[in-house]
Amino acid sequence: MSPQTETKASVGFKAGVKDYKLTYYTPDYDPKDTDILAAFRVTPQPGVPAEEAGAAVAAESSTGTWTTVWTDGLTSLDRYKGRCYKIEPVAGEETQFIAYVAYPLDLFEEGSVTNMFTSIVGNVFGFKALRALRLEDLRIPVAYVKTFQGPPHGIQVERDKLNKYGRPLLGCTIKPKLGLSAKNYGRAVYECLRGGLDFTKDDENVNSQPFMRWRDRFLFCAEALYKAQAETGEIKGHYLNATAGTCEDMMKRAVFARELGVPIVMHDYITGGFTANTTLAHYCRDNGLLLHIHRAMHAVIDRQKNHGMHFRVLAKALRMSGGDHIHSGTVVGKLEGERDITLGFVDLLRDDFIEKDRSRGIYFTQDWVSLPGVLPVASGGIHVWHMPALTEIFGDDSVLQFGGGTLGHPWGNAPGAVANRVALEACVQARNEGRDLAREGNEIIREAAKWSPELAAACEVWKEIKFEFEAVDILDVV
């Protein structure tokens, strides 16, 4: 990088530019239990040594700047600086390496994902000395976790609210995502819930557009779910999207949902922002609302392997900020999601203590110290033939969400919901009897279809539908 060009200054310090590694590369440093630890995938510009690039990441995401400043003498740099304490090669990649950086906890505001990300994934990602930079994982120390409320309710409380146990929950996104009137939208909600689904969902695009204003949608959807509850004897929900252009409008929608007595609202947490999300999560806990989270815009940030931020980091951030559900990919559907990587961040969402496991992309052991868990939502291009794989991959503590796989049924919405509920119950029963869902899945579905004409029709429609493309973001070859 820049050569050392120090000159004497009359104020008693050496002005100029010096290599970052002199201050911020500390291979002998032993990280503290209270440090936030980060694993960065670094691709430096040609000629930039790994140690200098790693130190630059630590500096520019903590206390450093491009030149020596006299106010450095007014603080304790050793107390507040980030430290690159380890450099690790990436198998099969000569131009990349993993830089491990430790950040003192005092650098971050308590209970603020916004502040944490502003430092760790801020201006450093535009640093010219780096060709690319990706945040692969974070270790959030117990001391910082305890400053967050986390999910409004968590997995067990949600099951108790819904009185549903021993199986994944079933959902459906109402389609077409845009253009329906509020009354027709409510009709679709009613038909899906009556047919056996636990939830229906606003699409992430649905806020308050001219064809369907939010208040009208909320009213018709509430009417639909209460009618379906009365007919089925089951508790039902519809994810009413409270996302809005301002936090004030978002909260107005959440308050109206609470007044209607519905069980759950929804937020687009990346486009809406972490400050808005945490605000809404606190309201939901205080007022008994579940909170469904959509991750719209995540792939802009996390899909490319050498630059951006891995979704496991966004998942950890969401658990801290607050949400009871979050979309997590399907492994088998139309959206990006390699199996081992997906299972890794599903563990980070649901479990209380997760060991380091590089085979699943987990760089650090994470202790959530009883912060409530988040239900992963599998959604996007899935249908009844995927049910055995989804049940086997995600287990009971998940939401399986079939949009086109419900509303695309040749007989209508309610039969589409029936087909999915029958397929799910068949898979859960087969699993409980000790059958191998991965090996016998298709046979289990065929057997169930003999007793359900709705399922048989769905099986016929989607028997040839597959999404067989290789994932872009895959684990490094060791």
From Swiss-Prot:
It catalyses: 2 (2R)-3-phosphoglycerate + 2 H(+) = D-ribulose 1,5-bisphosphate + CO2 + H2O; D-ribulose 1,5-bisphosphate + O2 = 2-phosphoglycolate + (2R)-3-phosphoglycerate + 2 H(+). Its EC number is 4.1.1.39. The keyword Phosphoprotein does not apply. CDD domains: RuBisCO_large_I. Residues 1-2 form a propeptide. Substrate binds at N123, T173, K177, R295, H327, S379. Keywords: Acetylation, Calvin cycle, Carbon dioxide fixation, Chloroplast, Disulfide bond, Lyase, Magnesium, Metal-binding, Methylation, Monooxygenase, Oxidoreductase, Photorespiration, Photosynthesis, Plastid. Mg(2+) binds at K201, D203, E204. The modification N-acetylproline is found at P3. The record marks K334 as: Transition state stabilizer. InterPro entries: RuBisCO, RuBisCo_large_chain_AS, RuBisCO_lsu_C, RuBisCO_lsu_C_sf, RuBisCO_lsu_fd_N, RuBisCO_lsu_N_sf, RuBisCO_lsuI. The modification N6,N6,N6-trimethyllysine is found at K14. Signal peptide: none annotated. Its main location: plastid. Gene3D superfamilies: Ribulose bisphosphate carboxylase, large subunit, C-terminal domain, RuBisCO large subunit, N-terminal domain. The disulfide bond which can form in the large chain dimeric partners within the hexadecamer appears to be associated with oxidative stress and protein turnover. NCBIfam families: PRK04208.1. RuBisCO catalyzes two reactions: the carboxylation of D-ribulose 1,5-bisphosphate, the primary event in carbon dioxide fixation, as well as the oxidative fragmentation of the pentose substrate in the photorespiration process. Both reactions occur simultaneously and in competition at the same active site. Belongs to the RuBisCO large chain family. Type I subfamily. This is Ribulose bisphosphate carboxylase large chain.
